[in-house]
Amino acid sequence: MGSPEERFHFAIDRGGTFTDVFAQCPGGHVRVLKLLSEDPANYADAPTEGIRRILEQERGVLLPRGRPLDTSHIASIRMGTTVATNALLERQGERVALLVTRGFRDLLHIGTQARPDLFDLAVPMPEVLYEEVVEVDERVLLYRGEPGAGSPVKGCTGDLLEIQQPVDLAALRGKLEGLLTRGIHSLAVVLMHSYTWAQHEQQVGTLARELGFTHVSLSSEVMPMVRIVPRGHTACADAYLTPTIQRYVQGFRRGFQGQLKNVQVLFMRSDGGLAPMDAFSGSRAVLSGPAGGVVGYSTTTYQLEGGQPVIGFDMGGTSTDVSRYAGEFEHVFEASTAGVTLQAPQLDINTVAAGGGSRLFFRSGLFVVGPESAGAHPGPACYRKGGPVTVTDANLVLGRLLPASFPCIFGPGEDQPLSPEASRKALEAVAMEVNSFLASGPCPASQLSLEEVAMGFVRVANEAMCRPIRALTQARGHDPSAHVLACFGGAGGQHACAIARALGMDTVHIHRHSGLLSALGLALADVVHEAQEPCSLSYTPETFAQLDQRLSRLEEQCVDALQAQGFSRSQISTESFLHLRYQGTDCALMVSANQHPATTCSPRAGDFGAAFVERYMREFGFIIPERSVVVDDVRVRGTGRSGLQLEETSKIQSGPPHVEKVTQCYFEGGYQETPVYLLGELGYGHQLQGPCLIIDNNSTILVEPGCQAEVIETGDIRISVGAEAPSMIDTKLDPIQLSIFSHRFMSIAEQMGRILQRTAISTNIKERLDFSCALFGPDGGLVSNAPHIPVHLGAMQETVQFQIQHLGADLHPGDVLLSNHPSAGGSHLPDLTVITPVFWPGQSRPVFYVASRGHHADIGGITPGSMPPHSTTLQQEGAVFLSFKLVQGGVFQEEAVTEALQAPGKISGCSGTRNLHDNLSDLRAQVAANQKGIQLVGELIGQYGLDVVQAYMGHIQANAELAVRDMLRAFGTSRQARGLPLEVSAKDHMDDGSPICLHVQINLNQGSAVFDFSGSGSEVFGNLNAPRAITLSALIYCLRCLVGRDIPLNQGCLAPVQVIIPKGSILDPSPEAAVVGGNVLTSQRVVDVILGAFGACAASQGCMNNVTLGNARMGYYETVAGGAGAGPGWHGRSGVHSHMTNTRITDPEILESRYPVILRRFELRPGSGGRGRFRGGDGVVRELVFREEALLSVLTERRAFQPYGLHGGEPGTRGLNLLIRKDGRTVNLGGKTSVTVYPGDAFCLHTPGGGGYGDPEDPAPPPGSPPLYPAFPERGSVYEYRRAQEAV
């Protein structure tokens, strides 16, 4: 056996379709290989086969397949694998049982209670990973010194704890033995507060291993962080995936002599570090493959481009990964993959459902790319297997892919080349739809050629991929144009120039091994060992010594672990982190002090406080110096430097580059002659003028016109991107431009939201993301709205239009308006809307409006939180703004708005705002968000011209109108075909008996409808009155649900609809009426009535279950999940929020640590869903035990009238609110009340179930294979932001 330099080093990326092998051979030269990950006819394991081939070729010795390979010539093997990801996607992991604290058996099913898709009535959600649940009799509480509590114990965080009930191991033993007899051998153990008191989990784990369980994942070991829900999901994923990974590793080892005993074998983890194969676990493996690519460009492109920040762009067949590197890895500590939230360090790799295999559609006049994908089978149309038309087909039609450069592996026999003819045929069908649409309008437009249609889809795909890059950079205060675009992956080279140009980037860097950069990254990566523990300390001089002691202990653990792997101390470096947040907020940042040396006012490990303040300012634009800083976790990352040293350079070339051939590629101006070069024949110094194609074995690079490529010393390609030419289009409808403008308009609203979230200070806006930002036309009509909070959808438009009518000409540059009044389009008073007009030179009136609506935690009134259950007038609910100039002539009117916010204090029994500082800060943030919108609108007008931008504003509204008309026409046609009338109706009641009535008359010819709410009840004395804007929001939400696919959500959705709402009714009350319950309760009933009229689904729980708890010291508010209604083809989802709300619920451990309550139960309410061919979803049972005297308020519905069933389905069970006094007396509180509670009292909330659908005696169809959820999942911080934004 020779020295490591005389042996082979392999780095292997085992992907879902291909396995890439990168080998450094003896002598230092490199060999690369790409082969199919699955080819059972020829080999059992792709990585082993790749190693065999290279050893055979390099050594010139025949190595028969199937025999264990001699390892004497192998020094190391590094691998990234999608084994864990695929097992998660396909739900092919180990059989698992969940062991959880009694009372929480359904906690992971309920999760955050938010649904992933606001507008999908079926509420598709991933099934839990565990097969069975065992409730463990044990309970740990945070110590509060109540009488009879006993002596406290100290947790590892420093918190004092009360062991209310030790683990009953005797009772648990029999349950575990039962699991073993049923064939379950893997456990996830998740107990309340085990992040700080792990002893109970350890006792359970010891018993389970003694009984013979082969794998036990303790949540306190897998990820010791507070919040039981994500920690529980992580432990389940670990128990589900680790046995699968271990089996794969053992199978891989058997392919080698001695089972790789003398070979260093390392696997890439999700955090970008390598780990020994024995320490490679499921919860740390889901990004194993993509992480290699980030390491690859961070160690190559970043260095070669002089330390300029880099955006990684990895475009594959089904999705695209986007990431960022600026000198250090960017990690997230909670992210979802395949619907499972993992609480573990992961590189922030943002995956979007847009890739070469993304399908192309023409829908209601709009070019649509994805998110559906052709997958590997059948693949794109050009694969010759009958697949759909995709982005790859569009590129092939445009001449940007050359079939001759691909191997003949396509067709049923996998022996044919790519088929341009199949691509053209599939695209021609879509082109016919496009041209039919263009010919059908009142002013027929010019027909589009096949190439123009293909080009349109490519441009739309590019814009779709630009949006997450903008979000990833601008969300953290970075300018995307200041970055280099590092392009890798099989499909990215065809799009890199266009994407860089659209983002204003000057440079694209494509590594010479870009087609297998993930494998290269594995070769260059270091071995990492991390140690982390939770903490509960303030960041103050008094705690610095404790923090240093903890960090030193963790550092010692990391060093010992790395030295045990053979690293010397000189090869090991460590980096310390503190997970910090401001007191009273949830926004924690994991900060390193590497760039902030220790001072006399910091821990010895570094000035973490300065690092925190600097990063907080950069990401959010402000700091909160008056608040203390809290340490949630301490963490140390140890690195053993072990990456290979690659010295490849390219020879200087004196002659011109060799042109392999000249082909024809289609660009904006038509076909152009395009030289083709082979990457392997290019050398250092060669310069290539665009357009041209550069072909490699693994990728195709398109250098667009106006761009110039050069080969640099390392053999990489650097492309200088020319500036984007001015956009010369006219005001006539162009479906391609319509799709691009749809993205651009939405991007403006999204970026406004990013600025608002960054600069706001309150928890509601900054962390719960309870806000919306929107763009409006000169008439106040909605153009784009992001995100889609249902209750805001139609209401903001009413607000802007009211201000236009109210103020007339009294609106000038530098003015900003504030409004929340229900009669002015408001939903309820805490939702403050800030409106800014957009003026343009030469125009006397505003050309657009931008607005932001945010939920302020308090604006005064009779109760804290400004949501009183018993209000009878609007004034009791807080400060009222009909039309208020928040900024006048560019000056923020702080004194006047302060006076208005304090004005409710002048009313008997009321208070002014209880948090003026946050109100003012958030209002300034809303002004700043609007200003960003003005800037972006100005850039759009500057690029296209005012006439064009306003024309496409109208076109995009007309597109939404067309989609709704198509839906109404299809609904009417379906009824007519069945001999049914074109009129439908529905009626339901609020619990006080007030009817909500609806009659809908469909006009089949026009595709329009009249929605008539006549007959609805009168305005009520309480607060269930819903302003007209609420009904419009409910209607636009329902229309979007009924359309059933993504459409632009704007004014056009309501254009085909006439809405009749009687004045003075509960749906259009007088200006003085109380409305807080209308926003959160009546809105749900309106939705039930609309969907019931259309027969779309049975009633959902119809309630938000509003619960408020408060005293002089604290205040808490939550809304609670229930059952969703069943529909034609689906059972209702249990334990989820429905329709007009999607609020996430506070994690049980956070709830108990911050508020004086014990959460005794949070589980499903079996049998509460209505029976039917398809069952309604079950509600939940949530029981709170109080530890202090407080005022409990409940504001609920469906306590008298049951959620209806449809087509023979039975209704769901009514809700129930029970107060259980300490002495055992149980009282039914009714639907709406306030009551004083005392220590030991309990509140037990039973939420309603959903209605059933279809006759219960009709058997439901047998379940088929569960769909992958989603088949090509989005992930990363951008996705998590949008998911959180929609969960309000």
Swiss-Prot record:
Protein EC: 3.5.2.9
GO CC annotation terms, alphabetical: cytosol
Primary enzyme class: hydrolase
Reactions catalysed: 5-oxo-L-proline + ATP + 2 H2O = L-glutamate + ADP + phosphate + H(+)
Gene Ontology terms describing biological process: glutathione metabolic process
Domain of life: Eukaryota
Listed Pfam families: Hydant_A_C, Hydant_A_N, Hydantoinase_A, Hydantoinase_B
Region (Disordered): 1248-1273
Compositionally biased spans, kind Pro residues: 1259-1270
Family under the similarity heading: Belongs to the oxoprolinase family.
Subunit details: Homodimer.
Job description of the protein: Catalyzes the cleavage of 5-oxo-L-proline to form L-glutamate coupled to the hydrolysis of ATP to ADP and inorganic phosphate.
Name of the protein this chain belongs to: 5-oxoprolinase
Species in which this protein is naturally found: Mus musculus
The encoding gene: Oplah
